[in-house]
């Protein structure tokens, strides 16, 4: 059912569930729903981990503390294996990226109509609850990683070293500078683009499949497809968060390597 109360066709149902709650227009359009849910999930991550840190004990830990410790050790192990260098920011960044993206992805397992229907009852016409299925969110996170790549590249190599890396690789000859510059610029830009679009594409496809199941099948038969897909989607949710974290660490490790 739409915001105006009319019964939607399957096509209208799908279109309605893929429409964001927005303000502004054109380039300045802001997807309010994606912003709200991403901030709330980020706050949930900070609150829960801080709560565990404050109440951490050297005795017998609780279930939540055990889970957090396992998660921290998992991320720390990946950082030690991938990142070659010393940097106190990388491990916390990796943990934040993994948990935050996982929580955003996890919203995809909530029944399609559950939160949007409740929002409609309160007068909110449109609501999408999976922030990582919004390309603006995923590309914003990837852009943040891109700026960190530039920052650490310049910090470690200096402006001259960074420019030299862009102009004298892979062909170390002045005549090849234009070709090198094009190749290295494309390589550099492709990192955040692929990082953001990979996460968006996988989560958008997953959300769309849930919506298609809900929009095209009778309510009593939806579980036949939605339950197996949800079980499989748990793997995708976790894997995409892991891939984003690992590639972030890899890119930052590469940024701090001085190729001379």
UniProtKB/Swiss-Prot annotation:
It is a multi-pass membrane protein. One of its GO terms (biological process) is proton motive force-driven plasma membrane ATP synthesis. GO terms for molecular function: proton-transporting ATP synthase activity, rotational mechanism. One of its GO terms (cellular component) is proton-transporting ATP synthase complex. Its main location: membrane. The keyword Disulfide bond does not apply. InterPro entries: ATP_syn_F0_a_bact/chloroplast, ATP_synth_F0_asu, ATP_synth_F0_asu_AS, F0_ATP_A_sf. Pfam families: ATP-synt_A. CDD domains: ATP-synt_Fo_a_6. Keywords: ATP synthesis, Cell inner membrane, Cell membrane, CF(0), Hydrogen ion transport, Ion transport, Membrane, Transmembrane, Transmembrane helix, Transport. Coiled coil: none annotated. The keyword Transmembrane helix applies. The chain crosses the membrane at residues 27-47, 90-110, 132-154, 208-228, 230-250. It is found in: Cell inner membrane. Belongs to the ATPase A chain family. NCBIfam families: ATP_synt_6_or_A (TIGR01131), PRK05815.1-1 (NF004477). Key component of the proton channel; it plays a direct role in the translocation of protons across the membrane. F-type ATPases have 2 components, CF(1) - the catalytic core - and CF(0) - the membrane proton channel. CF(1) has five subunits: alpha(3), beta(3), gamma(1), delta(1), epsilon(1). CF(0) has three main subunits: a(1), b(2) and c(9-12). The alpha and beta chains form an alternating ring which encloses part of the gamma chain. CF(1) is attached to CF(0) by a central stalk formed by the gamma and epsilon chains, while a peripheral stalk is formed by the delta and b chains. PANTHER family: ATP SYNTHASE SUBUNIT A, CHLOROPLASTIC (PTHR42823:SF3). This is ATP synthase subunit a. The gene is atpB.
């Amino acid at each position: 059912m739409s915001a105006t109360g009319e019964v939607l066709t399957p096509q209208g149902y799908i279109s309605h569930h893929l429409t964001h709650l927005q303000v502004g227009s054109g380039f300045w359009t802001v997807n309010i729903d994606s912003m709200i849910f991403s901030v709330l999930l980020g706050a949930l991550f900070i609150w829960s981990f801080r709560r565990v840190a404050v109440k951490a004990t050297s005795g017998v830990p609780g279930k939540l503390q055990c889970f957090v410790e396992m998660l921290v050790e998992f991320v720390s192990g990946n950082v030690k294996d991938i990142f070659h260098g010393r940097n106190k920011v990388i491990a916390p960044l990796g943990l934040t990226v993994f948990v935050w993206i996982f929580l955003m992805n996890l919203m995809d397992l909530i029944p399609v109509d559950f939160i949007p229907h409740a929002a409609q009852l309160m007068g909110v016409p449109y609501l999408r609850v999976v922030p990582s299925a919004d390309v603006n969110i995923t590309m914003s996170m990837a852009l943040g990683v891109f700026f960190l790549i530039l920052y650490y590249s310049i910090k470690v190599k200096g402006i001259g070293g960074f420019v030299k890396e862009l102009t004298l690789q892979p062909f170390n000859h002045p005549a090849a500078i234009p070709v090198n510059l094009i190749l290295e610029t494309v390589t550099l830009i492709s990192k955040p683009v692929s990082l953001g679009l990979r996460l968006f594409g996988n989560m958008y496809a997953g959300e769309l499949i849930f919506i298609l199941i809900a929009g095209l099948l009778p309510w009593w038969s939806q579980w036949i497809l939605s339950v197996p897909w949800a079980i499989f989607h748990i793997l995708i949710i976790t894997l995409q968060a892991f891939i984003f974290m690992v590639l972030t660490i890899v890119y930052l490790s590469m940024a701090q390597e001085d190729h001379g």
